[in-house]
Amino acid sequence: MLSTRAASADASDAKDAGTANIPNKRAILSRRKLAEDLETLVAEHGTGDKLRPALIARLRGALNDGRAEVRARFEAKGSGEDCVRQNCYLADGVVRSLADLTVTHIFPTPNPTSGEVFDIVATGGYGRGELAPFSDIDLLFLLPYKRTPRVEQVVEYMLYILWDLGLKVGHAVRSVDDCIRQSKADVTIRTAILESRYLWGPRKLFHRLRRRFDREVVAGTGPEFVEAKLAERDNRHLKLGDSAYVLEPNLKDGKGGLRDLQTLFWIAKYLYRVEDVDDLVGKKVLLPEEAHGFAKAQNFLWTARCHLHYLTGRMEDRMTFDVQTSIGNRMGYTDHAGTKGVERFMKHYFLVAKDVGDLTRIFCAALEAESKRPPKFNILRLAALARRKDVDGFVVDGERLNVRSDRQFKDEPLDMIRLFHTAQQNDIDIHPNALRAITRSLSVVGPKLRADPEANRLFLEILTGRKDPEITLRRMNEAGVLARFIPDFGRVVAQMQYDMYHVYTVDEHTLFALGILHKIEMGELTDELPLSSEVIHKVVSRRALYVAVLLHDIAKGRGGDHSILGARVAEKLCPRLGLTAEETETVAWLVRWHLAMSYTAFKRDLEDDKTVRDFVSLVQSPERLRLLLVLTVADIRAVGPQRWNNWKATLLRELYNRSEEVMSGGLSVEGRGRRIQAAQAALRDELSDFDAADFERHLALGYPAYWLAFDAETLGRQARLVRGRLRDERPLTVNTRIDRGRAITEVTIFATDHHGLFSRLAGALAAAGADIVDARIFTMTNGMALDVFTVQDAAGGGAFESGDKLAKLSVMIEKVLSGQLKPLHDLTKRKAPHASRTRVFHVPPRVLIDNNASTTHTVIEVNGRDRPGLLYDLTRALTNLTLQISSAKISTYGEKAIDVFYVKDVFGLKVTHENKLAQIRERLLHALADPSA
């Protein structure tokens, strides 16, 4: 009877390993009380249809009360491991109580046959005794052999009740034979059985399954299982981004997350038959401090994940920007001087993710050392090394470089740097014993070793030798050596860049940049980066380039301009590393100005000669120009996926080529006329379908700057567009050209010029769903305007190329210019992508007005939060101030917009009056304000 089961329910729960240590469990759920209540419901309503709503109401009440108790305890004490085990205990009680009721009253069988007896088994995370607040529960209904009608009825009844309670239930109905057969064929099912946990029933089937599983599935298949789980892990990392340092990490499946710890435990359980990570200490697989680190990392990750579930009210594993601050606050990370609480929290998260990686690496290395996983090495090289007992003071042990003794680094601190150098030079991995010896001896990396010329020589060779520095420096960073040897670098380890533009932490970004630099030099990126791949082989100061990439962001997070502060770091550090005075000066200059080339290319008008001349006066030499180009490309490429595109490549190439021309004596005042003549001559060849009269008429339309703004092919397309419009006397002509190579669409508009045209066109393009990344504005001698916009798709970047969208774009322009549509009205309907996520970032509005950047224009730079219609609002403000916009540079960096306008006043002159400048600043700051805020 159900009442008999109820009498021992709470006592049996106390024996469960996963829930034995939960204090005052009955405050979460008393199974005895619940069972008595269900017995009462059966007495009141019978077992028919009337019972169902009352049963669901009582079970839902038990769930809600229990969840509230678990949440209250969690928010008071903040232990994620306690939370997931208490949630598991609650789910266990509900499932067991429902099973008791179903088999006792709904489908009773006084004397069930052997085929009607079954066990219920928890699998997945639920099987481990871990259940996050909104996670699924996975159940296995374990049968002796084939299904019977009664078993099917019980399973169906239970599942429908659980689903009606709002629980997400994954389930399987299998016999013991099914489980064994499918476990052999499918590693996912094998893993589910491996971490299964008895939940309800007579237990005989569960014990039979575990005995057969160990004997028939696990025995002799260790290497196969290890390979499968590690391949599964590697594929998961590739899918989510193969880095632990993405700024919106996945707490469960991301690199360094809970799944990596679980993978480690699955392998340990499979190979060593352990039930707890602490058991691996006795097996001499992990050291006590490593097992302690496992427990700390797991509790931190579970705590963050439980907070994430409670904050979002759903099963959610990605820690997006909009929840990071709240989770950090709940976990006790407050603002300190110069550092936000969220930055401290995320730094701790990244350090935990790094610890998880260290544990996984040590564990897997130990497996390989015991030949439980086939090694993957260069066999010929290892055979040669194996014949040498001593390799630069180390030994080859199990195809890895090992220390002679655990005290080697304490006796010879220099060997800690030499170990990585030797591993790099011989393309060999490092033995886990050596990694452990490093961990125990990190204190030897102090002032004395940092001042050792030989240590610095070895480090500089690691960084600037012909072997890939990223691999070795990553090993040094993961081991904690890099931060100790270069303390300034230690300050940026796990340092997040709290915005939506940067994807990685500062140290991870830096290591990626070094890897990209090496690939450029090795010719591995020639197709993608032809100019950099050519230029790098002309570089003389090769060592300075590699050191500059290592140091370019080393002063981030200190407050102040990280370029200036970083240059000071370089001036002190480079001599220590062994660089000459000339190399030190070059490195410091590159760090100081590492943003100058991208700033000029992306935010200044490259057709303005003064832009190029000012840049050249800063750079001064062809060698610095080459160094700065390669550094800039590696830096941008390493920011994150999608941050580099062909449009940026085009602008950098144009700036490089024009700067090189100036340095070789080009771009002189006298030469400008010759360049215009050359451009017009090239256009003449392009326009073979124009007769002489047509060609001369077209030449008369353009002012000098126009002929230098485009190549001959583009000028030819525009000439045909202009001629067609003038012949047909159309009020407006719109032409689009998709350039997939540069991932942009070029929109050319030829229309009657009037005040405010650019602003209205910007509004029309934004309303059509286009992001404007560049604009060139020309007034022709006949009073017509030829405006060329470079756009991308606002929905996902890339070229704006959908047929429907292009058609909408043309219609939108026509309607706006004809007055049929107001851009402002349409734009208010559009929301910025990721609006809720960007809201957490504060982007101070800023307006900078520069009358020195151009000889003919006032240059206005505007910074603020990006949103749909921002460019329209800004240009409308400038138009209302009777300013003429000659050109614009539009850039977005995550949530931040940086727009630059070249303007003149109504008389065609620079704006110099202080009152007018103040008015411009005030109006633009007003336009930067988000109307939806």
UniProtKB/Swiss-Prot annotation:
Domain HD: 506-628
Provenance organism: Azospirillum brasilense
Intrachain disulfide bonds: none
Catalyzed reactions: [protein-PII]-L-tyrosine + UTP = [protein-PII]-uridylyl-L-tyrosine + diphosphate; [protein-PII]-uridylyl-L-tyrosine + H2O = [protein-PII]-L-tyrosine + UMP + H(+)
Region Uridylyl-removing, residue ranges: 391-745
Name of the protein this chain belongs to: Bifunctional uridylyltransferase/uridylyl-removing enzyme
Record GO biological process: nitrogen fixation; regulation of nitrogen utilization
Region listing for Uridylyltransferase, in residue ranges: 1-390
Highest taxon of source: Bacteria
Annotated domain remarks: Has four distinct domains: an N-terminal nucleotidyltransferase (NT) domain responsible for UTase activity, a central HD domain that encodes UR activity, and two C-terminal ACT domains that seem to have a role in glutamine sensing.
Role noted for this protein: Modifies, by uridylylation and deuridylylation, the PII regulatory proteins GlnB and GlnZ, in response to the nitrogen status of the cell that GlnD senses through the glutamine level. Under low glutamine levels, catalyzes the conversion of the PII proteins and UTP to PII-UMP and PPi, while under higher glutamine levels, GlnD hydrolyzes PII-UMP to PII and UMP (deuridylylation). Thus, controls uridylylation state and activity of the PII proteins, and plays an important role in the regulation of nitrogen fixation and metabolism.
Gene that encodes the chain: glnD
UniProt keyword annotations, A-Z: Hydrolase, Magnesium, Multifunctional enzyme, Nitrogen fixation, Nucleotidyltransferase, Repeat, Transferase
